[in-house]
Amino acid sequence: MKLVELLSAAAVLGALACNRAESQGGLTLEAKLPMAFAQLSNVVELGDGRIAFADTKEKLFFRADLKSGKLDTLGTRVDSIARDAPASQYKFPGWVAHLGGGTVALVDFSAQRTTLWDEKGQPLRVLPIARVSGDAPVLLYDTVGYGYKIDYQAILGGGEPGRTVRPDSIPVLRIGLKAGAVDTVANLAGPEYGDAIFGDQTQEAVKVFAPNDFFGVLPNGTAWVARGRENRVDWRAPDGRWTVGKSHEYTKLPVTQQDRDRVLAQVREHGKAYGMPQNLRVEYPFAETKAPFDLALGRPNGEVWLQRPRAREEDPLTYDVFNQQGAWQREVPFPRGSALAGFGAKGAIYAMIKTGDGAKTVGRYRLK
């Protein structure tokens, strides 16, 4: 078992502005699917109001209608993908994205390819994307012809043997889907490091719960960066001009022993797949306090929602909402057991909802 595989896995585990900001918000459940799923990806709303998503544990790609409760399985899951396999086949569907022209991209984590589908659920072709900075898939797309990739290669390894690279910043690459041209559109702050120990091996690793920057893009190519150390959102217009947001004060939550135990248990569980002995000594670097947010998702209307960390794993989630001018607007508490999964038209907010037996389903909410 390679130490870097465990380190990488643990690192992963890890519109117009209102003139007056609202202090609180709430959600009303409008509809949810009657069936349950093992583990869900993000949710993408289609033009007719239906949704597309993947079950990342059962490895299936779905289209669903929240009004009727109807569920369609798209394409075919296979155990291996040939080089010339049709677009209808996938091995590990892990992420869904909306592209231009009424098309949807399905990112296959295992086959390391992205397939293009129409909104009727028909496969169109394999999307040719220039391979830059390693084999990690492109997850972010706009509707004007670009994909976006965060260049984590220097952090996760792959450089010269015996040489450790710890960059101060991590570039975000913009890749033209037609011509393959690549440029850098943003830079994220580099993460904080500490020593991780697996048995008798010691290696630098990213600190768990330390602040990280997140990148996203709106359909028209407007990009944003949520700054973890400053707790703010900066915006990049399509012409390259930047607007620096305003930092928002937050209450720092301490990293507890319970938090540490939970993360290390997840590392051990993941290590089983690589044959890691369960009695192996495992230590991991942790931050003293939790970052102001641990997830960020952009809304097509020009908002960015930042997911606050929780004092306890069972606590309900709350999101801080920033507008396109970089100002904090409001907080939105979610019902217990639900988490943000995507956005849609006419104010639709999609969430993963726990069903009580460890499974999840998809629900559509509206702001009260």
Language-model features: locations:
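Bacterial N-terminal signal peptides that target proteins for export
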Residues: 1-7
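Bacterial N-terminal signal peptides
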Residues: 7-15
